[in-house]
C-alpha cells in the first residue's frame, strides 16, 4: 500500500478534550474522529487495527468451539422486562418507541436476546454444550463519556454466551473461555492479568476480569508475588489473622477538640493510625442501616459490605440519620453507647486489636483503651476492607500482594440460572424431565483493547504498536522518492517482496522532507521501518529500525527484508 493512495489525516496539535494518551494519539494519528460525545468514526488506519484484533478474537473463539452469529442492536422492551432488568438498568439504557408505540432499547449487552434464542431453539440435552458469540456494535448512554474509546457510548464488543445442562458442565465451558481469553491477550503481545472480580449488574456466581496493565488504568488490582492469585482490589480477599492478646488499659474518655479525622485524632493522642478504629454508618436506601468498623489506617470496601449484607445498594448515611443512631455528628462516631439499635459489622483486623481508640458519640470526645467484647459487642466479623500492597496473600503461605493499575478489556461470568430462570429457558434431560439451562457470558471490548494497547505501548513521539495489532507491520520510507528514480525503484522492490511474503507494508512515497516522514511514522507507530536513501543505497545498504527502542542498523536490502519477515512470523504466526 502506498501512502499517497491511503488516507492518514494526522494532526500536529492534540485536541483539547483528549485527556488520556490513547485518545490523544488515536486522534493525532488519524485513527478515529469524534462525531458526538462518546461516539467515534473508525478511520482507515484505526479500522485496520480493529480488524486485526477482531480476527485474533475470531480465531480463538472458533478454536474454543464457539459458533458465530449476529444479533440485532435494537431489542424489544418485553425481553428486558421479563429478565427484570428494564427497571434495574437505569438511564444508561437508551430507550425509545417505534411508530406503533412499542418500546425498544439499543442493546448495551445481549443476555436477554440470546436467552430468548436458547429457549426457542435449545430444547434437548443433546444440543448442549453450545456456545454462541458475536462481534457487535453496542450502545450504553454513559453519564460522562470520556477517554476516547476507553469509555465511549457506542462501542464494538465481542460477547459470547454458553449453555449447559448443569453447573459442572457450565464450569467446563467457563474454563474454556477463560483459557481462550488468555490466548487472545497473549497473542496481542499485551502485559495483562486475569483477576477475580465482582459480578456487578450482569449477575451470576463468579467472574474474572482481564486487565491490561497501564499506569493510566482506572482500576486497581492486586497480585501475589509468590503465586498466581490476582483480583480486582474491590474483590481481593483479606486474611483473618490470629486474635491478639487481651487489652490491659482501662476505657477512658478523652477530650479531642475539633479532631474529626483519624489522622487528626492519632496525631493529637500521639498514636499511630493503626491504633484507632474508624466507624462509618451506611444505609441501603430502604430503611436498613449498619455501622462498619475498620482499622484507622484501612479503608472500608463498600462492595464487600454490601455483598455481606445481601443489599442491592449501599450509601453513606446522612448526617440526620447518623445523629439518630449515635447522637453525634460525623467525626466522633463509635460503637459504644448507641442511641438506637444498629447492627455493627467489624473487619477481621479489628478483632485482633486491643486498647484502641474509638469515637465516643459525643462532639470532641473519643475513648482510649477500648476493647471488643469487654466494652461493646460486634454483630459480625467479616472481611470488609480494601486490600492493599503488602497484605498477605489469601491463597498461599508466604506471598504478599502487590498493587497495579489496570484497564479492563475482558470479563467472563458464570451466570448460572439468573437469566434462564427468569425467562424460563429450559430443556428436557435424559429422562424427559424439564430442567433449567445453565449459562455463562464472556465479553471483550474490541476498541477498548486497541486503546489499552496504546496506553501500555507509547512514548513521547507516538504509538509503539505490538506487531499483532499494528495497522501495518512495516513501513518503507523512500527519501526524495519523487526525484531519485533508483531510490523509488528499490523501495518499491522491497515493498513488493515483503507483501509477497505476507507482510503488510506501507510505502511512504510522499513528496515530503525526511524529518516530516519520520515524525509521522513515529506518531502512527508502525513497528518496523526500512528507510531507502540515495547515499546508503549507493553503498548497497538501507536503514532498518524497530519502533520499540531499536537502534538503527545499516543492512543490505536482502538482510532487511529477511529481518522483517522473521519478526512478523515470530509475532503474528497465527493461532497457537
Curated annotation (Swiss-Prot):
SUPFAM superfamilies: Class II aaRS ABD-related, Class II aaRS and biotin synthetases, YbaK/ProRS associated domain
UniProt KW keywords: Aminoacyl-tRNA synthetase, ATP-binding, Cytoplasm, Ligase, Nucleotide-binding, Protein biosynthesis
Pfam families: HGTP_anticodon, tRNA-synt_2b, tRNA_edit
Catalysed reaction equations from the record: tRNA(Pro) + L-proline + ATP = L-prolyl-tRNA(Pro) + AMP + diphosphate
Top EC class, one word: ligase
Superkingdom as given in the UniProt entry: Bacteria
BP terms from Gene Ontology: prolyl-tRNA aminoacylation
Molecular function via GO: aminoacyl-tRNA deacylase activity; ATP binding; proline-tRNA ligase activity
Annotated CDD domains: ProRS-INS, ProRS_anticodon_short, ProRS_core_prok
NCBIfam families: PRK09194.1, proS_fam_II
Function: Catalyzes the attachment of proline to tRNA(Pro) in a two-step reaction: proline is first activated by ATP to form Pro-AMP and then transferred to the acceptor end of tRNA(Pro). As ProRS can inadvertently accommodate and process non-cognate amino acids such as alanine and cysteine, to avoid such errors it has two additional distinct editing activities against alanine. One activity is designated as 'pretransfer' editing and involves the tRNA(Pro)-independent hydrolysis of activated Ala-AMP.
Family note: Belongs to the class-II aminoacyl-tRNA synthetase family. ProS type 1 subfamily.
Name of the protein this chain belongs to: Proline--tRNA ligase
Originating species: Trichlorobacter lovleyi (strain ATCC BAA-1151 / DSM 17278 / SZ)
